[in-house]
Amino acid sequence: MALLWLLSVFLLVPGTQGTEDGDMRLVNGASANEGRVEIFYRGRWGTVCDNLWNLLDAHVVCRALGYENATQALGRAAFGPGKGPIMLDEVECTGTESSLASCRSLGWMVSRCGHEKDAGVVCSNDTTGLHILDLSGELSDALGQIFDSQQGCDLFIQVTGQGYEDLSLCAHTLILRTNPEAQALWQVVGSSVIMRVDAECMPVVRDFLRYFYSRRIEVSMSSVKCLHKLASAYGATELQDYCGRLFATLLPQDPTFHTPLDLYAYARATGDSMLEDLCVQFLAWNFEPLTQSESWSAVPTTLIQALLPKSELAVSSELDLLKAVDQWSTETIASHEDIERLVEQVRFPMMLPQELFELQFNLSLYQDHQALFQRKTMQALEFHTVPVEVLAKYKGLNLTEDTYKPRLYTSSTWSSLVMASTWRAQRYEYNRYNQLYTYGYGSVARYNSYQSFQTPQHPSFLFKDKQISWSATYLPTMQSCWNYGFSCTSNELPVLGLTTSSYSNPTIGYENRVLILCGGYSVVDVTSFEGSKAPIPTALDTNSSKTPSLFPCASGAFSSFRVVIRPFYLTNSTDMV
């Protein structure tokens, strides 16, 4: 009887979805066939800007809502201004799309207008003749409640985890058979199955099994690893892929770094090279706050060995990097050989002569590795005191090696912070950032969308008194590009502009970068200057033509960017011949 009742549920209420991204509605009209256009995205309703809004776009809205066509495409908030986010701007439809979400636009929540420009439509009174009652959104909860009841089952599941009391659950084969992801369970011969899971994953097993019923599950920072592990073990490929995509989203949301380190260990244990590379990349861009966190002493040797060779590693200075390694070595168990391999990766030429001299007095590592430090210091002093053409001629140094190139140094010597927000927001973000991690970035009054600053021409001590002037600018509009003398196209905005008014040394080149900051403290992407401009990715993965940041920014927008100057010797320069 129970199985017959379950079957009737499936036959009467097909489908499992309620409101979805891209669903639309009309609001504030005098009748049902007119109103302000609102579209659903990520759990919220928002409006559409009237830039480029025309009858083809309005047709898409009206047809999706059951009307034959649109008679008017209205702008300037004809049905009153809306509230919440402006979801789409510069929409361009062909008229045949099923939703505005399928049309060309700037992307989700990327807009240059306010609610005074909300788009509206008037649809024809004629409908397609179809009137739909759709209660399918209730099915997911109904099926979930069937699992919660633990009644009328024909499959019994014993869940075991070391250190945990066994968990006894039951399921309904009929429901499981409708879900291909549950195949590993419903294909079991007999009426019972044993699930062996890690002890840490026992708390999420019930949610995992319920997902096979409701097709819905809440994934958090604390549960994503275990759900990914269970999905991988039991062939729930959609859940596995979803959790895999969430890793990049969740990594920046843990200022303690427990999650990135836990996921790195998980990736190493399971041989997941993509997740391992993702964790290493995030930790390299956020290396300095990692070294200042309580998690620093728990970082495994293999991870530090993966981080130190990277040029795109963000830290105040090379000296601070070496001090962090020194501190780590006193709080962890690492072999003499492992420590030597780590010190070999430190770029001694990027430290000034005075800093090199003081190492013998300030580092606990120095005495145990004195010969290595002396050799590396001599290499660095040659770099600082001998002109590049002489080094190339007599020493045969390969100046293209990473040891002679800077990393992403975030101190004021080599970088400047550019804001893209109001002064009030700047002050908030600055205070939040420096409460979490002290980088010594100086007074907040200096932080705005235009920055003039100076850096040495080159890290060599030979250039200590030779400064080069830079101007960095956040360019959100075509007007701002014209104001500051940049040539831009609307498709590339916003961008970061960088110019120099100083004479450039023909033996020196620059590989300058922009650190994209989310919430003022997490680096979620790094972009390169192509000529005088560096692209700014979108904060979220949208249907925009622009590339999203490698790690999504949950706030939906970036408010600060750190411009980093990276000089290097041009070894093929004619001045060196």
UniProtKB/Swiss-Prot annotation:
Glycans are attached at N69, N125, N362, N398, N543, N572. It is found in: Secreted; Secreted, Extracellular space, Extracellular matrix. One of its GO terms (biological process) is cell adhesion. Detected in embryo, liver, spleen, kidney, lung, heart, intestine, thymus and lymph node. GO terms for cellular component: extracellular space; membrane. Residues 24-124 form the SRCR domain. The keyword Acyltransferase does not apply. Residues 153-221 form the BTB domain. Keywords: Cell adhesion, Disulfide bond, Extracellular matrix, Glycoprotein, Secreted, Signal. One of its GO terms (molecular function) is scavenger receptor activity. This is Galectin-3-binding protein. Homodimers and homomultimers. The multimers form ring-like structures with a diameter of 30-40 nm. Binds LGALS1 and LGALS3. Binds ITGB1, COL4A1, COL5A1, COL6A1, FN1 and NID. Interacts with PPIC (in vitro). The unglycosylated form interacts with PDE4DIP isoform 2/MMG8/SMYLE; this interaction may connect a pericentrosomal complex to the gamma-tubulin ring complex (gamma-TuRC) to promote microtubule assembly and acetylation. Promotes integrin-mediated cell adhesion. May stimulate host defense against viruses and tumor cells. It comes from Mus musculus (Mouse). Its main location: secreted. Induction: Up-regulated by TNF and IFNG. Disulfide bonds join C49-C113, C62-C123, C93-C103. N-glycosylated. Residues 260-360 form the BACK domain. Residues 1-18 form the signal peptide.
